[in-house]
Amino acid sequence: MSDKLNALLERLKAHQRTLILAMAEHDGLPAGSALRQVAELENVIAAVEPVAAEETERAGRVG
């Protein structure tokens, strides 16, 4: 399960990075919806990281 969680983290971070880089291409402030997407991704990343770490630790104890 830790492999799947780590893969999810990588996908989330990659998507967030893509959004940020796209926002940087435009002059002025990004749209509020784009900012919300980045913030929501940050919240999900912050929630998944400890679960992934816990699963990795658990797998290390079992295996």
Label each region the model flagged.
Residues H15-T18:
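A short, structured beta-strand/loop element
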Residues I20-E25, L29-G63:
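Short, charge-rich amphipathic interface segments used for partner binding and complex assembly
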Residues M1-K13:
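Short, charge/polar-rich alpha-helical segments
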